[in-house]
Amino acid sequence: MRVMAVGVFDLLHAGHLHYLEQSKALGNHLTVVVAHDDTVRVRKHEPVTNHDLRKRMVEGLKPVDEAIVGNSPDVSIFEILPVVNPDIIALGYDQEHAEDSIRQKLNELGYGEIKVTRVEGLSDDLDGTRKIIARVLELSRNKD
């Protein structure tokens, strides 16, 4: 079973690793789509590291079989499906994507056989990049 996971993966942390470990457990091949820099800028924030470096970091993680950079924001994420050819799309616990709307779009595009599942989060206060940055800033302020 081929699994596809998608994310920004800016400043890798334990939450990312947990997401990818759980995603890999769903099948035997994990392809990770690392968000294109322009997509990150449009949907979230200015990335700290560029997509090529984030891809390289993700490729080095044990659960990952393959990592690719995703489409620019003017191209639908669904257009990457023929490249990845997943049986399962694994969503992170904190990703805003609605499973039902993804399933509906998959059906419309003729990919109704692809399963969509959401993996569990890591039970840690510092499981997200923004949380880690906030904690570092807090520690820095308290140091003074």
Model-derived segments and their meaning:
Residues M1-D144:
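Nucleotidyltransferase catalytic core that binds NTPs
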